[in-house]
Regions:
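Domain-level signal for soluble alpha/beta catalytic cores
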Residues: 1-121
Length: 121
């Protein structure tokens, strides 16, 4: 998981992603998940700059947020169609695999599928 309050490309424990660059060598894909859907494009772009061109990126945003007092809170604050529009932005930023993480539903994935069908025509 990447930290949304830190600069782009920083894990929750404060470790910058670039410190893992050598570990990515030979990977078929590297994924980012459990990041708020609206902020994921920037993270995908950052990761894309760290990877070889033949490495796919998986992007799985969430619908919810972390609360320091009660922990994780799922929310339906992002409608499936809006989430799908974010997923298209992740693709534009370099993701080749998109899906959903915490708080997403089958309706969310269906909306992504529909948007991808529209885009491909």
């Amino acid at each position: 998981c990447l930290c949304e309050q830190e600069p782009v490309g920083v894990l929750l424990d404060g470790t910058p992603l670039h410190t893992f660059s050598d570990s990515f060598k030979g990977a078929r894909f590297v994924g980012i998940n459990c990041v708020a859907a609206p902020t994921l494009s920037e993270q995908v772009s950052h990761l894309n700059n760290l990877l070889d061109d033949d490495v796919d990126i998986a992007a799985y945003g969430n619908v919810g947020y972390a609360d320091s007092k009660v922990g994780w809170i799922n929310t339906d604050a992002i409608e499936p169609e809006r989430y799908a529009s974010y997923a298209l932005q992740w693709i534009d930023s370099g993701a080749t695999i998109v899906g959903g993480c915490c708080g997403t539903t089958p309706e969310t994935i269906s909306a992504i599928h529909q948007q991808l069908k529209i885009r491909s025509t």
